Regions:
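Polytopic transmembrane helical bundles with strong interfacial aromatic enrichment
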Residues: 1-152
Length: 152
């Protein structure tokens, strides 16, 4: 693959998951229940997008290593991405299982976990940007040129 998909795909889960937490907060602050179904859909779609983006990142990992990106930098980004997915998966499970007697609903707990998820999402994005802007992951470099000499 000549152009990596991962940098294209990551924007969707970032936007969807962030908006899901925003909708949860708006619903709680404004006392409006109609934000919850939208937040649940955003969480689900954000998780789906996150899984696809993660798979694309794993697919692009070898190319980044071959381009000289340090493995420790890649692993840090990958670990944060997986932790982020795990936190948002917990939120999605909490949302799907709400209303069961054995899982009481705790909006403060949900929102607190959501804030942790947002912090992880931000850190994942930061270190992903580091891979691109510091190490040049996924950046095509021009072929070296030889200086032209004048004929005298």
């Amino acid at each position: 693959m000549s152009h990596p998909l991962h940098p294209i795909l990551v924007h969707f889960p970032i936007a969807l998951l962030s908006t899901a937490i925003l909708f949860e907060a708006l619903g709680a602050l404004l006392g409006r229940d109609f934000f919850r179904p939208a937040a649940t859909w955003l969480l689900g779609l954000g998780m789906l997008g996150g899984i696809v983006a993660t798979l694309a990142g794993l697919w692009n990992e070898e190319a980044a290593e071959a381009a000289g990106v340090p493995e420790t930098a890649i692993e840090r980004h990958e670990t944060l991405a997986l932790l982020t997915l795990a936190v948002f998966a917990v939120l999605l499970a909490m949302r799907w299982l709400r209303g069961h007697r054995w899982i009481p609903e705790h909006p403060a707990v949900f929102f607190s976990i959501g804030l942790v998820g947002l912090a992880l999402l931000g850190a994942t994005g930061y270190f992903g940007g580091d891979l691109v802007y510091r190490y040049g992951a996924g950046v095509e470099r021009p072929a070296p040129t030889t200086p032209q000499t004048e004929n005298r």
